[in-house]
Curated annotation (Swiss-Prot):
GO terms for cellular component: blood microparticle; haptoglobin-hemoglobin complex; hemoglobin complex. The gene is HBA. The keyword Transport applies. This is Hemoglobin subunit alpha. Residues 2-142 form the Globin domain. Red blood cells. Heme b binds at H88. The modification N6-acetyllysine is found at K17. O2 binds at H59. The lineage of its organism: Eukaryota, Metazoa, Chordata, Craniata, Vertebrata. It comes from Cavia porcellus.
């Protein structure tokens, strides 16, 4: 999915607004995903997926850091996320549908926290961004 100049600006501006809350919001999104789509817990049998757990917070930080890297490399996501793509394809073997679940839960979480700043334009741009990241992370599955 191609991000337009407006999408890139929306993503960068929104990520700047999120600032130091990225790990917290992503952890909340993960909790939403595990609650709404319990089959996603399959890939996390080795950690405590209960709401607010240290494991959820730690994984939220990992995902937030990866997304922050992606925001900084919007023009070359495949290179920026290459190692992470290898891990998801060859080691973790996460079913690609789970990325869609997480994307949805992240959008819901961001909408709740950003309020009026979560405009239809921001929503669309973030949706495209998360879909682009997911596409890169699943690109090496073949």
């Amino acid at each position: 999915m191609v991000l337009s100049a407006a999408d890139k600006n929306n993503v960068k501006t929104t990520w700047d607004k999120i600032g130091g809350h990225a790990a917290e919001y992503v952890a909340e999104g993960l909790t939403r995903m595990f609650t709404s789509f319990p089959t996603t817990k399959t890939y996390f049998h080795h950690i405590d997926v209960s709401p607010g757990s240290g494991d959820i917070k730690a994984h939220g930080k990992k995902v937030a850091d990866a997304l922050t890297t992606a925001v900084g490399h919007l023009d070359d996501l495949p290179t920026a996320l290459s190692t992470l793509s290898d891990v998801h394809a060859h080691k973790l073997r996460v079913d690609p549908v789970n990325f869609k679940f997480l994307n949805h839960c992240l959008l819901v979480t961001l909408a709740a926290h950003l309020g009026a700043d979560f405009t239809p334009s921001i929503h669309a741009s973030l949706d495209k961004f998360f879909a682009s990241v997911s596409t890169v992370l699943t690109s090496k599955y073949r």
